[in-house]
Amino acid sequence: MALKSSKAVSEEQHGYEFFGPPGAFAISFLLPVLVYVFNFVCNDISGCPAPSLLSPKTLSLDKLKQEVGWPQDGFAGLVSWEASAATAGYILLSLILYRVLPAHEVEGTELRSGGRLKYRLNTLYSSSFTLAILAAGTAAQGAEFPVWTFISDNFIQILTANTIFSYAVATFVYVRSFSVKPGNKENRELAAGGHTGNMLYDWFIGRELNPRVVIPLIGEVDLKEWLELRPGMMGWIIFNCSWCAQQYRNYGYVTDSSICITLVQAVYVFDSWWNEPAILTTMDITTDGFGMMLAFGDIVWVPFVYSLQTRYLAVHPVSLGPVGLAVMLSLIGLGFYIFRSANSEKNNFRTNPNDPKVSQLKYIQTKKGSKLLISGWWGIARHINYLGDWIQSWPYCLPTGLAGYQILNAGAQAEGALVMRDGREVVQGEAKGWGMLITYFYILYFAILLIHRERRDDDKCHRKYGEDWEKYRKIVRYRIIPGIY
């Protein structure tokens, strides 16, 4: 649903981002390969990383394939009808719940055309309903609940199904974007940076700003907003729970480290669902087009990369103990407090500047009419919320310790080995520390992501506000980390 207004805003100048077409190609076709590498190299067959990778001089492709569990029928084994059907069913369930469960409608920010789009928000209800079904199944059947065993048995094939889906969605919205006409009554718009004329880049970055489709029996769905918070974020929690169940099947217990990561990540996800209206003011919704970048990120990258730590712990359990657990919870509490307080302050100021909670905040009145906060959280750093977000990433990775393990055959009787129920033994051995390249990848990646997003936002705001933004930067000097950066 769209609301019209007579006001219109001219399109800002916009150049290439992500190093233009070469960067778009690399991200679109190499990142999916990286996800497969992570999930093959760190496995429950031979180790994390696969032992052959620690001895490159004697490395052979045939031996590596055996160690990582490469399908016997090659690339064809990466796909299965069962995993594809399960993925389709999961997406269909999410769409049905989006339509049938109660929701409240919220207007988005003003578009360049002067209109506003309406959004149907009920992610918290639909996701809670799904989790309730999974909880009931787990209560009845424990770690052998078929959903958990299906995920662990078909994980690579599920990854393939979701990857294909992300490519399909990106291609569909790109082709459909050519039907956008100026002044259309649906308030369809092209993204400012998404129609450069380079097909690959526009497909990657997203040509249409807010693509919407009408699905039979479901109704209108805003693809970008729906995918941002639903299948991928929900999948993140589901995968974590699946790996906790796998750890229980392997050892007969679930460690505090697995529980800690699963719970703190669930809190992060539930917070985004609880504050779903706030997403409508983010760069993803207001500025970026919807293309391969967001489709792959939402559908594949988030659930399959963000759950790497619990997948690791399913094979190599780590006990934090009371002190370690307290440190992890303190970090997540600090990060969450900064992240949510800063975002709430900004959102409250934008939606109701007369609210007593934010009415005392100082700001710069720009020539464009917008107000730039220079006190409160946003007077400390231009993106202080990113600092909180990054701090929250530490407890996701730290519980894995000096990661790395090797899996030995049953009866090896290795000293200090963890013994699985099937008799196989897990030791760190020469792999100790090397697994950190995988389990700590998230901290490094997330730092790069946040720095890049801040730079993009800074460039966008400088183009938009000009001298006012330069004045703002002199007052609020630091970008993300006060006193450092």
Swiss-Prot record:
Localization (cell)? Membrane
Instruction: Tell me the pathway.
Output: Steroid biosynthesis; zymosterol biosynthesis; zymosterol from lanosterol: step 2/6
Q: Which PROSITE patterns match?
A: STEROL_REDUCT_1, STEROL_REDUCT_2
**Residues the entry annotates as binding NADP(+):** K346, R350, L373, W378, N385, Y386, D457, C461, H462, R463, K464, Y465, Y472
Q: Name one Pfam family in it.
A: ERG4_ERG24
InterPro entries xref list: ERG24_DHCR-like (IPR001171), Sterol_reductase_CS (IPR018083)
Q: What class of enzyme is it?
A: oxidoreductase
Q: Which family does it belong to?
A: Belongs to the ERG4/ERG24 family.
**This protein's name:** Delta(14)-sterol reductase
- Source organism per entry reads Fusarium vanettenii
- Which lineage ranks, top first, belong to the organism behind this chain? Eukaryota, Fungi, Dikarya, Ascomycota, Pezizomycotina
